[in-house]
């Protein structure tokens, strides 16, 4: 069926919102899921190969520390720098460059001759990895109807956990037979094999094309893959704020977005602070409390499993209720679960339930925030908004990794330690509620010629 007359511009967002999900949108989800899966694999890979690598090179934990931290710093740099480029060059171009980058650099890591070379390569790999995830989020969000966006983006993000798990299984199989370098080679070759499919099948965002006032024929061709047929001369629009292509980063701090942007940053920072503190130091807390290493690791693993389930559930609820309140409630419940762990016996079965529930709420809220952010910003600087939130949040992860040891060395009791651990979760809940009070003014639409 042909679309409205040529004198009636078609709003790309409304057009997508008013149609059932097409097979091509599911294909975009699968492709983005695979990118995030390989992203998760590569982010976690150093932890899996560290024991073998340190033994092979005769390194102490202290000497290997810069290699581990270099990748995390790179993730923050990549997230902060990639967004503005994606808002100017396009989501697909930057995404292809990012995947090519972390694939080739992962291969290069396998041939590093010393920890200094490896640290530099992991920094560069982290930059490419940091650029990939926010662009996956933005591209997928711009092709999804609002009614399903949160759920489908959270499904995409479960690929990160699955990629981390895949890294563990592959490492357990490859390292005994082929050594630690084989894991890095696998981490480079697998996404490299995906690149031709991404180049061929992954589209540029139709909303990005409309916001940049690309020729209507390009927009029509992109929407045709979703089943659209348009009369010759049809014009396309995005009914969103327009800034006449001013620097995307500047728009984050404009009067309209400044407060909400800072609230998002605080939310993401605090959420990752809690998650990295928990994942990094909970095994040590449990071990110091008398549990075996195996049981401490198993209980901590339930945090991630609960998080994968929580991400999908929170995303599903977000599509049906006020997203700010849903995320705030999840963070607050996560904080309560973490605080309650300090009152439980380490031998109690309730401890297992409490850790899984904390992961369900905390990781569920954190992943849901990834789905929330694309809807907060307009197309013109959406990639910048999402990527800067992720980049600032990475500093929460770095801070959490750094202060954990110092806090444990204070010799505080478990109840007080878990209370301190839960406090940032309540701060995250308040911050996302504050974001809900940021009001956006209506502005004219942008029409593609």
Swiss-Prot record:
Q: A Pfam family this protein belongs to?
A: MFS_1
Key word Transmembrane helix present in the record?
yes
Q: Which PANTHER family match?
A: CARBOXYLIC ACID TRANSPORTER PROTEIN HOMOLOG (PTHR23508:SF10)
- Report TM segments: 26-46, 62-82, 92-112, 123-143, 155-175, 183-203, 262-282, 298-318, 326-346, 349-369, 388-408, 414-434
Q: Does the keyword Nuclease apply?
A: no
Q: Which family does it belong to?
A: Belongs to the major facilitator superfamily. Sugar transporter (TC 2.A.1.1) family.
- Explain the purpose of this protein: Transporter that specifically mediates the uptake of gallate.
Where does this one sit in the cell? Membrane
Q: A cellular component term (GO) from this record? A: plasma membrane
SUPFAM superfamilies to which the protein is assigned, alphabetical: MFS general substrate transporter
Q: Give the UniProt keywords, A-Z.
A: Membrane, Sugar transport, Transmembrane, Transmembrane helix, Transport
Matching Gene3D superfamilies, A to Z? Answer: MFS general substrate transporter like domains
* GO molecular function terms listed in the Swiss-Prot or TrEMBL record: carboxylic acid transmembrane transporter activity
What protein is this chain from?
Answer: Gallate transporter
Q: How does it sit in the membrane?
A: Multi-pass membrane protein
**Chief location category:** membrane
Highest taxon of the lineage: Bacteria
Please tell me the species this chain comes from. Answer: Pseudomonas putida
């Amino acid at each position: 069926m042909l679309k409205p007359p040529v004198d009636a511009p078609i709003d790309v967002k409304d057009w997508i919102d008013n149609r059932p999900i097409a097979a091509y949108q599911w294909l975009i989800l699968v492709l983005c899921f695979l990118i995030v899966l390989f992203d998760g694999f590569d982010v976690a890979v150093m932890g899996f190969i560290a024991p073998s690598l340190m033994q092979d090179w005769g390194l102490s934990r202290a000497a290997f520390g810069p290699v581990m931290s270099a990748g995390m710093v790179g993730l923050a740099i990549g997230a902060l720098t990639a967004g503005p480029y994606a808002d100017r060059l396009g989501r697909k171009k930057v995404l292809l460059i990012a995947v090519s980058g972390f694939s080739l650099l992962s291969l290069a890591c396998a041939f590093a001759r010393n920890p200094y070379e490896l640290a530099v390569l992991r920094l560069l790999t982290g930059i490419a990895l940091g650029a990939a995830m926010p662009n996956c989020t933005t591209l997928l969000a711009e092709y999804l109807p609002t009614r399903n966006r949160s759920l489908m983006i959270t499904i995409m993000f479960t690929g990160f956990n699955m990629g981390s798990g895949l890294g563990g299984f592959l490492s357990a199989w490859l390292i005994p037979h082929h050594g630690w370098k084989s894991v890095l080679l696998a981490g480079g070759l697998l996404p490299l094999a995906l690149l031709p499919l991404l180049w061929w099948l992954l589209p540029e965002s139709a909303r990005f094309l409309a916001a940049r006032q690309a020729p209507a024929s390009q927009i029509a061709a992109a929407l045709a893959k979703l089943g659209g047929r348009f009369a010759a001369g049809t014009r396309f629009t995005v009914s969103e704020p327009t800034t006449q292509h001013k620097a995307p980063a500047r728009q984050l701090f404009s009067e309209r977005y400044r407060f909400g942007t800072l609230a998002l940053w605080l939310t993401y920072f605090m959420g990752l602070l809690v998650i990295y503190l928990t994942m990094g130091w909970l095994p040590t807390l449990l071990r110091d409390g008398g549990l075996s290493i195996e049981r401490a690791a198993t209980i901590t693993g339930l945090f991630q499993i609960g998080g994968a389930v929580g991400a999908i559930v929170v995303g599903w609820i977000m599509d049906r209720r006020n997203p700010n309140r849903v995320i705030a409630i999840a963070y607050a419940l996560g904080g309560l679960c973490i605080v309650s762990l300090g009152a439980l016996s380490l031998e109690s079965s309730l401890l297992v339930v409490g850790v899984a529930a904390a992961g369900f709420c905390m990781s569920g809220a954190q992943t849901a925030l990834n789905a929330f952010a694309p809807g907060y910003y307009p197309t013109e600087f959406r990639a910048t908004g999402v990527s800067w939130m992720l980049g600032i949040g990475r500093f929460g992860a770095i801070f959490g990794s750094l202060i954990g040891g110092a806090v444990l060395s204070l010799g505080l009791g478990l109840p007080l330690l878990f209370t301190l651990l839960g406090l940032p979760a309540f701060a995250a809940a308040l911050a996302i509620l504050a974001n809900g009070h940021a009001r956006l003014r209506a502005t004219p639409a942008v029409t593609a010629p």
